[in-house]
């Protein structure tokens, strides 16, 4: 932001969540102090603490509060230990991802000065992963779960790839590439997954033609 203040919603969660969020907010405050900015931190309880108080691990009201903030700091949690969804065990990161449509999982990788690396030229790249589709069973079905076991010895996972999802992740990938070294690699397995990865590759190539 270019303004002199910002607001951030902080979700501590449980386990090492408080430790993680404290370190994150310390870094945030230090960065803002350097540029003579301030931040208002709004803390929300989620996870098991929320489940005990509100019978849900993530209250819907929190999403509305997050809309008014400039960012969200999400602490860690052990959502695999939560009760079923119908008993209030919502995965906070999944709820946030779906509600705000956070489709791009942006992961920079860069070696630091003074640290040795086996790559002579160093590392400075960004991995752009589509975050709303694929094999994960919490995001590949409109209703129900995209995983099933027809027998006790057989498990099946359904993969969901759409033209919309493939196109927009390619678009943001090219946007980042244009602002950096103008190099982009689309990673796929279209030689085997001909329909699903084939559709992704088709979309990535279509987007590339608009950036020539």
Question: For the regions a protein language model found, what residue spans apply to each?
Answer:
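Single conserved hydrophobic/aromatic residue that forms the stacking wall/gate
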Residues: 1-7, 11, 211-212
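Short, polar/charged alpha-helical segment
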Residues: 21-32
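Buried hydrophobic positions in well-ordered alpha/beta secondary-structure cores of metabolic enzymes
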Residues: 14-17, 70, 128, 173
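N-terminal beta-loop-helix "entrance" segment that forms/cooperates
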Residues: 37-58
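Short, ordered loop/turn segments at secondary-structure junctions
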Residues: 13-15, 46, 77, 111, ...
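N-terminal glycine-rich phosphate/adenylate-binding segment common to multiple enzyme folds
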Residues: 51-148, 155-156
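A structural signal for isolated positions on well-ordered beta-strands in alpha/beta enzyme cores
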Residues: 9, 40-42, 183-185
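Glycine-rich phosphate/diphosphate-binding loop of Rossmann-like nucleotide-binding domains
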Residues: 16-23, 151-212
């Amino acid at each position: 932001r270019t303004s002199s203040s910002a607001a951030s919603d902080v979700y501590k969660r449980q386990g090492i969540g408080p430790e993680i969020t404290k370190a994150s907010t310390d870094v945030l405050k230090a960065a803002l102090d350097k540029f003579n900015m301030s931040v208002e931190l709004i803390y929300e309880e989620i996870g098991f603490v929320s489940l005990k108080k509100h019978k849900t691990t993530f209250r819907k009201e929190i999403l509305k509060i997050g809309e008014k903030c400039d960012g969200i700091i999400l602490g860690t949690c052990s959502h695999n230990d939560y009760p079923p969804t119908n008993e209030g065990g919502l995965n906070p990161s999944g709820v946030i991802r779906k509600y705000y449509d956070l489709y791009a999982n942006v992961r920079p990788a860069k070696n630091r000065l003074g640290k040795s690396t086996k790559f002579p030229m160093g590392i400075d790249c960004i991995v752009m992963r589509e975050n709303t589709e694929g094999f994960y069973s919490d995001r590949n079905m409109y209703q129900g779960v995209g995983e099933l076991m027809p027998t006790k010895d057989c498990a099946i996972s359904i993969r969901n790839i759409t033209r919309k999802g493939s196109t927009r992740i390619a678009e943001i990938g090219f946007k980042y590439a244009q602002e950096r070294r103008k190099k982009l690699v689309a990673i796929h397995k279209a030689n085997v997954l001909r329909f699903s990865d084939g559709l992704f590759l088709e979309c990535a190539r279509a987007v590339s033609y608009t950036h020539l």
